[in-house]
UniProtKB/Swiss-Prot annotation:
Coiled coil: none
Matches recorded under InterPro entries: Calcineurin-like_PHP_ApaH (IPR004843), DNA_Repair-Maintenance_Comp (IPR050535), Metallo-depent_PP-like (IPR029052)
Gene name tied to this protein: yydB
Family: Belongs to the metallophosphoesterase superfamily.
Protein name per the record: Uncharacterized metallophosphoesterase-like protein YydB
Organism for this UniProt entry: Bacillus subtilis (strain 168)
GO molecular function: DNA binding; DNA exonuclease activity
GO BP annotation list: DNA repair
Length: 481
C-alpha cells in the first residue's frame, strides 16, 4: 500500500510579477502531468497563503481550487496551516509578545496566559481563520490552535507555529504554546501509530525556528508518537534533515521552497511517495526554470539528490515486515501440526491439478539473493525447515490425505505467489502477503489459535519455497520507476 502527496508552501499570492504569474499557471499543468503518473492522496499547504497580511480574495481561492482539481482531490484531503504572512499585526499584540519574550520563562508564561491575553494573540490570525472556514468548509479549531487528522493510511498533526510570530529575525525564538501542542499530539493512538500508517506533522516554520528547549520537547514528542515526517516552509529554500542518532524513532524534516519568483525565493515544491509496506520513501523536489519557463526535477540539492530524488527509509515501517515474519521460537507439537495439514486439506475442497517440478529447483542461497530476502527471513526459514520432514511424511502417505488432494497446499501457495509477486519488491514482503492472505481465508474454519495458524502457514509456505517453483524470480533485475 502506498501514499502519495504534494507539499506546497509560501504561495504569497498577492505578490505578483511576470515570472511568478507564468510559473503559477504552469504549475497547475505540471501537477496534472504528475497525477497521470500516479494518483495523489492528499495536499499539504504549509502557510503564507497571503502576502504581508493581505486579504484572501476570490483569486486566492480560485487558484487553490485549481491546485486541488489538478491533483484530483477534494478539500477533505487538504491540510492547511497559517504562516507568518497570514498574521495581522497591531501594537497591542506586539506589546504583549514583547512582554512574554522578556519574562524569565517565556514558554511557561505563554502556557499560563489568561483568556483575554490569549485572545489578543489569536486575533492576529482572525483573517486566516475566516478564510479557512470559508475555503475549507469547516471552522479552524482556534481554541485548540494545534489539531490532529487521522485516517487509515495517514495521520496529520497540524502545528500552528505563528502564535507569537510578529517581526523579522524571530527565528530561533518562536514558541508554540506547548501545553496546547501536547494536548493535540496525545490524542494520537500510539498503538495505531506503530502500525502500517504514515504519521506526519506540519507547520509553517522549520524546527530550527522554534526556541531551543521547546524544539527539543517537540522532537521528543515526535519520538514518542512515531512521527515519520515533519514538513515546513518559511525559509523559501528547500532542504531536508534526518534526525538520525538523536531519537529512537528518527524522522525526516522536509522544507519546501516558495511559489514566487524574486531575488530571494527558490520557486520549488515537493512530491512524496511512501510505501507503507516497507517504509521506502521517495522525495522529489521540483524547481522552476526561469529562463525556459518550465518545471523539472531539482538535482542541485546535494549529493543525495543527484538523480533529482531523495531516497529515504522509514525504519519503523520496514521493521513491521520483520515483525510479521518473526514469531516465537517455541517448538511446535508435530501431531498437532499434522492435524493442521489434514484440516487444511479438508478446508480446500476445490482445487486444480498442480505438478511441482522438483528437477528444476535452484539453490536456496540464489533464491534468497535474487529475491532480496533479509536475514530475518533466512533465519526463520532455517528454523522452519526442521518441520519439512513432517510435511513430506504426510505427503508420501495416503494414510493422512487422499492421493487426489496431495497438491492442494502447494497449489494454494503457488497461486498466491503468482497473484502477488509482481506487486512487491522483495521476498520478505511477498512471503508476508502470502501468509496473511491464506490466514484470512482459512483461520475462521480451523480450530487453532491465531498465532499457531499463522505459524503453521509460515512453515508450509517455506516448505513450498523449498519444494516448488516459486521464489525463482530475480527482483534485483527489476528497476523501480
Amino acid at each position: 500500500m502506498k501514499v502519495r502527496f504534494l507539499q506546497i508552501s509560501d504561495l504569497h499570492f498577492q505578490f505578483q510579477n511576470y515570472d511568478t504569474i507564468v510559473m503559477r499557471d504552469k504549475l497547475l499543468d505540471f501537477i496534472e502531468v504528475l497525477r497521470r503518473e500516479s494518483d495523489f492522496d492528499f495536499l499539504l499547504l504549509t502557510g503564507d497563503i497571503a502576502h504581508k497580511g493581505d486579504v484572501y480574495n476570490e483569486d486566492v481561492k480560485e487558484y487553490l481550487n485549481g491546485i486541488i482539481k489538478s491533483m484530483g482531490l477534494s478539500k477533505n484531503n487538504v491540510h492547511l496551516v497559517p504562516g507568518n504572512h497570514d498574521i495581522s499585526r497591531d501594537m497591542t499584540r506586539t506589546l504583549l509578545i514583547d512582554s512574554i519574550m522578556k519574562s524569565p520563562n517565556p514558554s511557561e508564561m505563554l502556557d499560563k496566559l489568561d483568556q483575554k491575553a490569549t485572545n489578543i494573540l489569536v486575533e492576529g490570525q482572525r483573517k486566516f481563520f475566516d478564510f479557512y472556514e470559508d475555503f475549507m468548509g469547516v471552522k479552524y479549531p482556534e481554541e485548540d490552535l494545534h489539531f490532529l487528522y487521522q485516517s487509515e493510511k495517514y495521520n496529520v498533526l497540524s502545528i500552528n507555529t505563528c502564535l507569537l510570530s510578529d517581526k523579522k529575525g524571530e527565528e530561533g525564538t518562536l514558541l508554540t504554546a506547548q501545553m496546547k501542542l501536547y494536548k493535540a499530539i496525545r490524542k494520537m493512538n500510539k498503538e495505531k501509530n506503530k502500525g502500517k500508517v504514515l504519521n506526519i506533522a506540519i507547520g509553517h516554520h522549520t524546527l530550527g525556528c522554534i526556541e531551543s528547549s521547546e524544539r527539543e520537547s517537540i522532537k521528543a514528542h515526535f519520538d514518542d508518537y512515531f512521527i515519520d515526517l515533519y514538513l515546513a516552509g518559511h525559509v523559501h529554500d528547500s532542504s531536508f534533515n534526518i534526525t538520525a542518532n538523536t531519537n529512537e524513532n528518527p524522522f525526516l524534516e522536509l522544507v519546501s521552497g516558495a511559489i514566487i519568483k524574486d531575488e530571494y525565493a527558490t520557486p520549488e515544491f515537493i512530491s512524496v511517495d511512501v510505501n507503507l509496506d516497507n517504509g521506502e520513501t521517495e522525495v522529489t523536489y521540483y524547481i522552476w526554470n526561469t529562463e525556459y519557463k518550465y518545471w523539472s526535477k531539482n538535482n542541485q540539492g546535494g549529493r543525495r539528490l543527484q538523480e533529482g530524488k531523495l531516497n529515504y527509509k522509514i525504519n519503523r515501517l520496514e521493521s513491521l515486515i520483520e515483525k510479521e515474519i518473526e514469531d516465537n521460537d517455541d517448538k511446535i507439537d508435530e501431531d498437532e501440526f499434522k492435524s493442521f495439514i489434514i484440516d487444511f486439506h479438508e478446508y480446500r475442497e476445490s482445487y486444480k491439478t498442480f505438478t511441482s517440478n522438483f528437477d528444476n529447483q535452484i539453490g536456496l542461497d540464489k533464491k534468497f539473493y535474487d529475491m532480496k530476502s533479509g536475514e530475518t527471513f533466512k533465519r526463520k526459514f532455517d528454523s522452519y525447515s526442521e518441520y519439512f520432514g513432517v510435511i513430506n511424511h504426510i505427503m508420501d502417505s495416503t494414510s493422512y490425505v487422499s492421493a487426489d488432494k496431495k497438491e492442494l497446499i502447494a497449489e494454494t501457495i503457488v497461486d498466491k505467489y503468482l497473484e502477488f509477486h509482481n506487486q512487491y519488491n522483495n521476498g520478505d514482503e511477498i512471503f508476508v502477503k502470502i501468509v496473511n492472505e491464506i490466514y484470512l481465508e482459512c483461520h475462521s474454519v480451523l480450530p487453532y489459535s491465531k498465532a499457531l495458524t499463522k505459524k503453521y502457514i509460515k512453515i508450509l509456505t517455506c516448505w513450498c519455497i523449498y519444494e516448488c517453483e516459486i521464489f525463482n524470480d530475480n527482483k534485483r533485475s527489476v528497476k523501480n520507476d
